[in-house]
Design a protein with these regions (language model features):
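N-terminal glycine-rich phosphate/adenylate-binding segment common to multiple enzyme folds
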Residues: 1-35, 120
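Non-catalytic beta/alpha edge segments that cap or flank active sites
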Residues: 2, 7, 16, 29, ...
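Structural motif
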Residues: 6-10, 17, 59-62, 91-94, ...
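Short acidic, glycine/serine/threonine-rich loops at helix termini
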Residues: 20-24, 72-77, 105-108, 127-129
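A glycine- and small-aliphatic-rich helix-loop capping segment at beta-alpha/alpha-beta transitions
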Residues: 25-29, 77-84, 131-142
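Glycine-rich phosphate/diphosphate-binding loop of Rossmann-like nucleotide-binding domains
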Residues: 28-99, 111
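Glycine-rich phosphate/nucleotide-binding loop
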Residues: 102-169
Length: 169
């Protein structure tokens, strides 16, 4: 890796945003996808990021949004971040617009500690960060719920060897 001191955690919302599954066809020639952002959803994931930082000795939480354009949806995420940050005075905070933040992760990932983002941005940024660290296939993933969690293997699904009895799932 070009960044041997890279040590960041990406916390992404995983139920809302453009991945909420709210899509429909308007006409035969046009479709629409709606971006869902709720106060409880924002608070849940942002609080998780701060609690993770606190419990793991992390010093900084960075929020990334595109609230310069999406003033209501991403604005709610950013405003919730700013409000909750006051409950964690020992943790440094900052906010970056997602395109600038992604460029900074690509250039200087060591600058980051914990990053919290809405769903789509987190999906993209986590793959960028994994590739910077060596390979998209090396990015571990955990979906943490209040009652159930799901963990994804870092090696990929290897469909080319499925059914050959050569790998331990």
């Amino acid at each position: 890796s070009k960044h041997p001191n890279m040590n960041l955690v990406i916390v992404r919302e995983n139920e809302e945003d453009l991945y909420g599954g709210i899509e429909h066809r308007l006409t035969p020639e046009s479709v629409q996808c709606l971006k869902l952002t709720t106060q409880p959803g924002c608070e849940r994931i942002i609080r998780y990021a701060f609690e993770y930082a606190r419990s793991h000795g992390r010093k900084k939480v960075t929020c990334m949004t595109k609230d310069n354009i999406m003033k209501l949806t991403d604005g709610l995420f950013h405003a919730t971040f700013d409000a909750l940050a006051k409950e964690y005075p020992e943790i440094e905070t900052d906010h970056l617009i997602i395109d600038i933040g992604t460029a900074r992760v690509a250039d200087t990932p060591e600058w980051f500690d914990v990053i919290v983002l809405p769903n789509l941005y987190g999906d993209i940024l986590s793959d960028v960060a994994a590739q910077i660290s060596g390979s998209v296939g090396l990015g571990a993933s955990a979906n943490i719920g209040t009652q159930t969690s799901m963990f994804e293997a870092i090696h990929g699904s290897a469909p080319q060897i499925a059914g050959q009895d050569v790998a331990n799932p």
